[in-house]
């Protein structure tokens, strides 16, 4: 039986800012640029009490908490701390799969230290993070990645939770189905319309029914409802693409997609920074009301060097959609692919990761 730990830093960017600037401690801190198109990169726990969340438009965050302190992101500093944390991970196992600057999966089935109990390994890792970075982390311990990720949220902040193999069903079945990664607001509504509210409800549905309604995602739902996840922890997994997408509650015309494309471009921009990689190809994804999927892409000579550059390319790709004007769209996505190692493009990285996005 595998022993998987998911470690997630607590309000990472905001916590780094509060650590480095004592005047911010105890205050609602929002890591974001101000501006109509800006989105929240991170919110301190004080800010979260006002309903502020990551990826929320910054203007909405400002309305929710006018007294919030807005701090522009400093990704170079966050990356430096992330490297410290990853060094701690590697003391315990070489099987470390970073998901972003602030979270990773670890397979500690055969830990370097010889420690046998995954709970003790997770506790030691969290203690070392606290002592060496003055930051806190939460951890989930389980037999697979899916369960470990859910567990890491259970005792946030600064806690850990274990799902033992013998307790998987007792833990999983009562959960609302939206705790399954990938089940967002729209999917949650579709499942509820079928009478599926909890994981227990989901488990009662046959695979064929779920596939009929949700295609390949139906198979994923079927497996997750049974706590099945055989994906290995893949060390130093290279990011192939980064994207953000939205499914609408009502289908929209093409010319109504611009504000959504702008917001998704910013989410993708920030997500790219967290991966520490550079994407060159801009991809626009659309799904029509009759579920036809279209993608349009453009590869400039150099990667987009600013947020506005990414937005402009993504918006320009809508002009390459040659469908009747009455066509309606139920989903839009913006992505970056064609990633290169930043060390091979140091000059580009300096521009890409060092500049302040245009507002």
Swiss-Prot record:
The active site is at 103. Disulfide bonds: none annotated. Gene3D superfamilies: 3.30.70.270, 3.40.1170.60, 5' to 3' exonuclease, C-terminal subdomain, DNA polymerase, Y-family, little finger domain. Keywords: Cytoplasm, DNA damage, DNA repair, DNA replication, DNA-binding, DNA-directed DNA polymerase, Magnesium, Metal-binding, Mutator protein, Nucleotidyltransferase, Transferase. Its cofactor is Mg(2+). It is found in: Cytoplasm. The record marks 13 as: Substrate discrimination. Poorly processive, error-prone DNA polymerase involved in untargeted mutagenesis. Copies undamaged DNA at stalled replication forks, which arise in vivo from mismatched or misaligned primer ends. These misaligned primers can be extended by PolIV. Exhibits no 3'-5' exonuclease (proofreading) activity. May be involved in translesional synthesis, in conjunction with the beta clamp from PolIII. Monomer. This is DNA polymerase IV. It comes from Xanthomonas campestris pv. campestris (strain ATCC 33913 / DSM 3586 / NCPPB 528 / LMG 568 / P 25).
């Amino acid at each position: 039986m595998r022993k998987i730990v998911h470690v997630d830093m607590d309000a990472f960017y905001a916590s780094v800012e509060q650590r480095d600037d004592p005047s911010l401690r105890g205050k609602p801190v929002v890591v974001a640029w101000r501006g109509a198109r800006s989105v929240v990169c991170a919110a301190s726990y004080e800010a979260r009490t006002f309903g502020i969340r990551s990826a929320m438009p910054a203007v909405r965050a400002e309305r929710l908490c006018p007294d919030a302190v807005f701090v522009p992101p400093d990704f170079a500093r966050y990356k430096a701390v992330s490297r410290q944390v990853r060094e701690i991970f590697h003391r315990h196992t070489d099987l470390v799969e970073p998901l972003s600057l602030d979270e990773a999966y670890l397979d500690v089935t055969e830990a370097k230290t010889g420690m046998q109990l995954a709970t003790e390994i997770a506790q030691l890792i969290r203690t070392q993070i606290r002592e060496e970075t003055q930051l806190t982390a939460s951890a989930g311990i389980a037999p697979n990645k899916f369960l470990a990720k859910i567990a890491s949220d259970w005792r946030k902040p600064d806690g850990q939770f274990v799902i033992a193999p013998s307790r998987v069903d007792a833990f999983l079945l009562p959960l609302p189905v939206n705790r399954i990664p990938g089940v967002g607001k729209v999917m949650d509504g579709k499942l509820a319309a079928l009478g599926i509210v909890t994981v227990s409800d989901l488990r009662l549905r046959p695979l064929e029914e779920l596939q009929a309604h949700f295609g390949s995602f139906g198979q994923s739902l079927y497996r997750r409802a049974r706590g099945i996840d055989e994906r290995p922890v893949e060390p130093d997994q290279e990011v192939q693409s980064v994207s953000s997408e939205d499914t609408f509650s009502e289908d929209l015309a093409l010319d109504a997609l611009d504000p959504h494309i702008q917001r998704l471009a910013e989410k993708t921009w920030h997500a790219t920074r967290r991966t520490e990689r550079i994407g060159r190809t801009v991809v626009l994804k659309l799904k029509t009301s009759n579920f036809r999927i279209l993608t349009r892409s453009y590869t400039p000579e150099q990667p987009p060097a600013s947020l506005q550059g990414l937005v402009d390319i993504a918006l320009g790709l809508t002009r390459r959609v040659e469908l009747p004007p009455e066509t309606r769209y139920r989903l839009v996505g913006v992505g970056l692919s064609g990633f290169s190692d930043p060390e091979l493009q140091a000059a580009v990285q300096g521009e890409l990761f060092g500049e302040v996005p245009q507002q």
